[in-house]
Amino acid sequence: MAHKKGVGSSKNGRDSNPKYLGVKKFGGEVVKAGNILVRQRGTKFKAGQGVGMGRDHTLFALSDGKVVFINKGKGARFISIEAAQTEVAAD
């Protein structure tokens, strides 16, 4: 039976800060330009029309509109922004 802790226990005990990854705006939600849509590691989702990608693969809205998720085949998932419908008042 050991009477000293050994070297293993003193080298443990670290943890990393949470990164808060995932989808931030879901399909059908109305967004403004600059809103973050998805925080991700790698390109789990790809940028579609009206969506930009940051250097850490974060997807964000380039224009105002509604979020649309599109699945194209196997493993190709795109996020696009559908332009907001402008309502005209009838006289």
Curated annotation (Swiss-Prot):
Keyword Transcription regulation (UniProt): no
Q: SUPFAM superfamilies, from UniProt?
A: Ribosomal L27 protein-like
Which Gene Ontology terms cover its molecular function?
rRNA binding; structural constituent of ribosome; tRNA binding
Q: What is one Pfam family matched by this protein?
A: Ribosomal_L27
Arranged from A to Z, the UniProt key words for this protein are: Ribonucleoprotein, Ribosomal protein, RNA-binding, rRNA-binding, tRNA-binding
- Any GO BP annotation: translation
Q: Which HAMAP family match?
A: Ribosomal_bL27
Similarity section: Belongs to the bacterial ribosomal protein bL27 family.
Role, per record: Binds the 5S and 23S rRNAs and also the tRNA in the P site.
What is known about its subunit structure? Part of the 50S ribosomal subunit. Contacts protein L18.
Name of this protein: Large ribosomal subunit protein bL27
**Species name:** Deinococcus radiodurans (strain ATCC 13939 / DSM 20539 / JCM 16871 / CCUG 27074 / LMG 4051 / NBRC 15346 / NCIMB 9279 / VKM B-1422 / R1)
Q: What is the lineage of its organism?
A: Bacteria, Thermotogati, Deinococcota, Deinococci, Deinococcales
